[in-house]
Curated annotation (Swiss-Prot):
<keyword id="KW-0520">NAD</keyword>
<comment type="function">
    <text>Catalyzes the NAD(P)-dependent oxidation of 4-(phosphooxy)-L-threonine (HTP) into 2-amino-3-oxo-4-(phosphooxy)butyric acid which spontaneously decarboxylates to form 3-amino-2-oxopropyl phosphate (AHAP).</text>
</comment>
<feature type="binding site">
    <location>
        <position position="266"/>
    </location>
    <ligand>
        <name>a divalent metal cation</name>
    </ligand>
</feature>
<dbReference type="Pfam" id="PF04166">
    <property type="entry name" value="PdxA"/>
</dbReference>
<feature type="binding site">
    <location>
        <position position="274"/>
    </location>
    <ligand>
        <name>substrate</name>
    </ligand>
</feature>
<dbReference type="InterPro" id="IPR005255">
    <property type="entry name" value="PdxA_fam"/>
</dbReference>
<dbReference type="GO" id="GO:0000287">
    <property type="term" value="F:magnesium ion binding"/>
</dbReference>
<feature type="binding site">
    <location>
        <position position="136"/>
    </location>
    <ligand>
        <name>substrate</name>
    </ligand>
</feature>
<keyword id="KW-0460">Magnesium</keyword>
<feature type="binding site">
    <location>
        <position position="137"/>
    </location>
    <ligand>
        <name>substrate</name>
    </ligand>
</feature>
<comment type="subunit">
    <text>Homodimer.</text>
</comment>
<keyword id="KW-0479">Metal-binding</keyword>
<dbReference type="GO" id="GO:0050570">
    <property type="term" value="F:4-hydroxythreonine-4-phosphate dehydrogenase activity"/>
</dbReference>
<dbReference type="GO" id="GO:0008615">
    <property type="term" value="P:pyridoxine biosynthetic process"/>
</dbReference>
<dbReference type="GO" id="GO:0051287">
    <property type="term" value="F:NAD binding"/>
</dbReference>
<feature type="binding site">
    <location>
        <position position="166"/>
    </location>
    <ligand>
        <name>a divalent metal cation</name>
    </ligand>
</feature>
<comment type="similarity">
    <text>Belongs to the PdxA family.</text>
</comment>
Amino acid sequence: MGSNQRIVITPGEPAGIGPDLVAALAQQAWPVELVICADPALLTARAQQLGLPLRLHSYRPEQPATPRPAGELTVLAIDTPAPVAAGELNVANSHYVVETLARACDSCLNGEFAALLTGPVHKGVINDGGLPFSGHTEYFAQRSGRERVVMMLATESLRVALATTHLPLLAVPGAVTRQSLDEVITILVHDLQQQFGIAQPCIYVCGLNPHAGEGGHMGREEIEVITPALDTLRAKGYNLVGPLPADTLFQPKYLQQADAVLAMYHDQGLPVLKYQGFGRAVNITLGLPFIRTSVDHGTALELAGSGQAEAGSIKTALNIAIDMIKHRNE
């Protein structure tokens, strides 16, 4: 995997299940050093609340990466300014959440870490704290100086990328342009090759409108925007199928041929994927200068500290990040 064997993890909202999931990760050994960017007192208290053993080591960037045995983690300490109670949001800690994201992102940009894994944040309380925040994907893109990144969610058998992300449905048609599709598909194909080891990815592309526009009778975006964009990329050797109606495309006989599906908007593609693999799916940001994976669920405040939070998604996200590091280093 190379000399850089550290993955930084941000637990996210301190009152949510993020700290629980980190404590769960610590219960097994991993082939990389996990560095948790968080308040060590928070991690210790939550592990004690859950009855899980946890020993913390201070992060020392000058020392070689050291994978820890079960029950131990490395922590890059950032303290919460206000007390944390499991399940109870506190707007006073919203700046802390963003500070952990900034520190982790900057440390990936300077090469300290091979990948970043994010736990769930609560966007509402961050915005209530006076920090405009629409999501991890947009935040990391802006901080990394990338104008275009791609959100992709993945299960063991399905990958769904999005042409647009957190936009009102009314704004989607205007955001789907020939240029935007060219940029999104170029990033998608490049990262499937470089980070997933797929030499010639086959991408199935959804139409925007019902029945993919029905020959222009239900919208003309497929004729005037999507098909011309795909034809231009096909001429460069890209393996693209579509645009196809989404309700046709998301059938097993089509999906088994696809390395990834490109949906035009958030709620076109993600309900299918989450129905198939909720709790086991992973959110991946493509197009960043570093590897970033995330859980596919929210903060689940009602489960924080209860011992009932499922760690399947964060474990899958960590395993995928490790695999992506291997492919990138090949």
